[in-house]
């Protein structure tokens, strides 16, 4: 239906925009040219727009001519047309590298695609603007926290996914409280939530990690549980609590 198509198109392009933002900040794009922003501080025009048509995106002669004409026009409308064309060409190039995320689209997917970097109400502006957007450091895998751990790689993508689905998730739970039947399309938004890094570490360290320490203690009974966990750098590992003999027998 109509709503399903709208959601599919919006979610698909939101995913790709976030992925490209992550890739450009970390210099992962094949042509090393920023698509949504500029390496030059304070410059709002994306480097891809500035350097076009002299960019490695397999542009045809006709496409290069279109881009030159749009540039010469200089209007916001033509500038956004050029930006949209270049963005799509970048996605086509990334299809060869990440086909799961940048799939070969149906015609309607690109037909319904609209993007602008000049419109302050557009997702691009809100994403990259230094005053209102998400700090670039949050996307950078080289960003470290106070303890020297990377903070940009996993967390930012996860939280963007989480908050994209927040409205639908809340609405779904509200319907459940009213005993309204939920369609299958709503299930992912309500159940597939982002799990922060520390929770993943806690779960792994106290499951697989505990089994590994038990193995080490079986090999060498003098192995100290707490010391071993500290040696591995396991911050969330909880040593087994001392139990009374009667409890141990039942366990």
Regions found by a protein language model. Give the residues of each.
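Preference for the N-terminal adenyl/adenosyl cofactor-binding alpha/beta module
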Residues: 1-251
């Amino acid at each position: 239906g109509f709503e399903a198509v709208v959601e599919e198109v919006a979610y698909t392009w939101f995913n790709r925009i976030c992925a490209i933002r992550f890739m450009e900040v970390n210099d992962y794009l094949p042509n090393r040219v920023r698509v949504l922003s500029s390496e030059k501080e304070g410059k709002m025009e994306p480097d891809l727009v500035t350097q076009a048509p002299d960019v490695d995106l397999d542009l045809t002669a006709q496409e290069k001519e279109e881009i030159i004409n749009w540039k010469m026009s200089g209007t916001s409308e033509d500038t956004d047309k050029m930006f949209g064309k270049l963005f799509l060409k970048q996605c086509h190039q990334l299809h060869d590298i990440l086909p799961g995320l940048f799939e070969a689209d149906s015609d309607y997917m690109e037909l319904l695609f609209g993007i602008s970097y000049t419109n302050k109400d557009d997702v691009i502006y809100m994403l990259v603007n230094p005053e209102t957007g998400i700090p670039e450091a949050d996307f950078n895998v080289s960003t470290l926290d106070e303890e020297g751990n990377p903070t940009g790689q996993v967390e930012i993508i996860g939280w963007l996914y989480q908050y994209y689905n927040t409205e639908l998730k809340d609405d779904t739970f509200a319907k459940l409280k009213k005993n309204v039947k939920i369609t299958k399309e709503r299930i992912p938004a309500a159940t597939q939530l982002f799990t922060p890094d520390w929770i993943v570490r806690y779960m792994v360290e106290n499951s697989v990690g505990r089994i590994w320490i038990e193995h080490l203690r079986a090999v060498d009974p003098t192995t100290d549980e707490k010391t071993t966990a500290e040696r591995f750098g396991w911050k969330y590992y909880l040593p087994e609590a001392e139990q009374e003999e009667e409890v141990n027998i039942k366990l």
